[in-house]
Design a protein with these regions (language model features):
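Cytochrome P450 heme-binding "Cys pocket" and the immediately downstream C-terminal segment
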Residues: 167, 336-339, 472-479, 483-523
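Short, small-residue alpha-helix embedded
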Residues: 320-333, 493
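Cytochrome P450 I-helix active-site segment
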Residues: 197-204, 269, 334-385, 400, ...
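C-terminal helix/juxtamembrane-tail motif
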Residues: 521-533
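Cytochrome P450 heme-thiolate monooxygenase catalytic core
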Residues: 74-78, 116-325
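Conserved cytochrome P450 K-helix/beta-meander segment immediately N-terminal to the heme-binding cysteine loop
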Residues: 412-461
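N-terminal membrane-proximal hinge/A-helix region immediately C-terminal to the signal-anchor transmembrane segment
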Residues: 1-86, 95-99, 122-127, 131-134, ...
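Hydrophobic, well-ordered secondary-structure elements that form the walls
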Residues: 379, 404-407, 451, 476, ...
């Protein structure tokens, strides 16, 4: 095992994501001229060691098969615990965690996604297209910043899915653009960013973004406990926390009051229309079966569990789509040949109607389009939105032949891109050896630095999801349980964007592929120059 000591700024930045980078954060971090897939870092004097594991096959095995040896590191749960102390994210992998996951599993199940999520995500995606079309007209061929568009569209959908009400954020943003178009004087140069009205995000969207930023700051802090305490003392934190609590608690109570008059049979037959209804309905059924009253507000502990899980879903679902969509659009711009190939693949099977009507959401989600699926998979691989997955050893164990004591933080690099070292099979765990054939390869012999969706296609042109591992949503029991929703949303939005716009080249100073770390690795710049189709 290679050992690195001292406060090396480059190493610290690679580990905690505190710098702006062009490449995924931990790419080659553990193998940097050390010829080892496992290194031991001492990030500060007298600190406990941190282990970095940079072998995707072993990372996949640890996440999927060795959860009794590696549980979630307390660093991430601690960052959320002061905000959401009762959500499943902060719980150790065990009976309480699994029970809470089962309680909410209906929200991510196929019936809910098809009946509730599909029409809502389609409407939001069409709203995003209309907003971008209005902005493109106002820009007059100039580039404009689009991350806020993706952000507010993602928030509108996840808010509707979680709480069941419409915030009309996309419609309001478009109306603001339409009202300002005729009175706005644009820069003379077509390469200068257009002057576009700033999107007014809903108050809860601003609150979510604020709390995400505080979590990101605490994760980068040397003294996380002190930093979190300091943030909680700030007036702005207290205001946004009070707003969040009063809003969500009010929605929980109003929904409980509305459903409390239903009988057990009626509650059983009730179709869940949001995550809020799911949580309240199931809690009311539990109270009825336990002989507890349902015509009074939930006990504080019950309300807190519902509240925290709902807000956790809101936070997770909000940023995932915006970041994935941003990177996929940047890859479209940087690779015009891939953009045209994707558009042709879509037009061949999802042509617009004679009157310009869009393909239906059912057609988008059910039609097999191998190149679309390959493009999505390659986008997720290259974006590497979660560049470090942190676990802590719960017992003395081994990784690739190296002894790791109990209680040590282990940083796992999920990036599929660097050439793996040649590691003897006998050094791998038994579960790793047994699962070797789960994927056809762990490395592309032609190299993986370039953006190549074709690497995910079989010789007959079909999409092969087992070509390489994909750890965008982690793996094992702690895999993101919003994965199916995120992939559906990603697909619908990407299809409609490519069918409705050509993403033209940008000036060099607006086309940087540098990233910055918040909750996810996100692009530092997110500009587009659109030609409506």
């Amino acid at each position: 095992m290679a050992i690195v000591g001292g406060m090396n700024p480059k190493i610290s930045d690679a580990v905690w994501g505190t710098s702006v980078t062009r490449q995924p954060r931990l790419e080659n971090a553990s193998k940097m001229k050390l010829n080892s897939p496992v290194i031991q870092l001492f990030l500060a004097p007298f600190s406990n060691p941190t282990i970095i594991t940079d072998d995707v096959r072993e990372v996949k095995d640890i996440l999927s098969n060795r959860t009794h040896e590696f549980d979630r590191s307390p660093r991430t749960p601690d960052a959320y615990r002061s905000l959401l102390p009762h959500c499943s994210l902060v719980k150790a992998t065990g009976p309480a965690f699994k029970q809470q996951r089962r309680f909410w599993e209906g929200v991510t199940g196929t019936p809910f996604l098809r009946r509730v999520a599909e029409p809502k995500m389609y409407r939001c995606a069409l709203g995003l297209i209309d907003l971008l079309r209005a902005q493109a007209k106002m820009a007059g061929g100039r580039p404009f910043y689009c991350f806020d568009d993706f952000d507010v569209a993602a928030f509108e959908l996840i808010w509707e899915l979680v709480f069941g009400t419409n915030v009309d954020a996309i419609k309001n943003a478009r109306n603001k653009v339409l009202c300002a178009t005729s009175d706005t004087v644009q820069p003379p140069s077509l390469d200068s960013p257009a002057r576009i009205p700033v999107i007014q995000k809903p108050d809860m969207c601003e609150a979510v973004s604020f709390f995400i930023s505080t979590v990101a700051k605490s994760l980068k802090s040397v003294s996380q406990t002190w930093h979190l305490w300091y943030l909680r003392q700030q007036p702005v934190y207290k205001r946004k926390l009070a707003f969040k609590n009063s809003t969500i608690d009010g929605l929980i109570e109003s929904t409980r009051s509305e459903l409390a008059g239903l009988s057990e049979g009626q509650l059983m037959e009730l179709k869940e229309s949001s995550a809020l209804v799911t949580g309240v309905r199931r809690q009311l059924l539990a109270h009825i079966r336990q002989g507890q009253p349902v015509d009074v507000p939930f006990p504080a502990s019950v309300r807190a569990e519902i509240h925290d899980e709902l807000f956790m879903i809101l936070v997770a679902g909000h940023e995932t789509k915006a970041v994935l969509l941003s990177w996929s659009v940047k890859f479209l711009i940087a690779n015009p040949d891939k953009q045209e190939k994707l558009r042709k693949a879509l037009i061949d099977v999802l042509p617009k109607g004679s009157n310009g009507e869009q393909p239906s959401v059912k057609a988008i989600l059910s039609t097999s389009i191998p190149y679309l699926e390959a493009y999505m998979e390659e986008s997720m691989r290259a974006a590497n939105t979660s560049p470090r997955l942190v676990r802590r050893t719960t017992t003395d164990t081994q990784v690739l032949g190296y002894s790791i004591p109990k209680g040590v933080s282990v940083l796992l690099n999920p990036y599929i891109g660097t050439q793996p070292l040649d590691i003897p099979e006998h050094l791998r765990s038994e579960t790793s050896r047994n699962s070797k054939g789960n994927f056809e390869s762990y490395w592309d012999v032609s190299g993986m630095d370039d953006f190549q969706p074709e690497r995910w296609l079989a010789e007959d042109g079909s999409f092969n999801p087992r070509q390489f591992p994909c750890l965008t949503f982690s793996a094992g029991p702690r895999m993101c349980y919003g994965r199916n929703l995120a992939l559906m949303e990603f697909r619908v939005n990407l299809v409609l964007l490519v069918l409705n716009f050509k993403f033209d080249s940008l000036p060099k100073d607006l086309a940087s592929m540098e990233s910055q770390q918040r909750r996810f690795r996100m692009p530092r710049q997110c500009y587009v120059r659109l030609s409506p189709l």
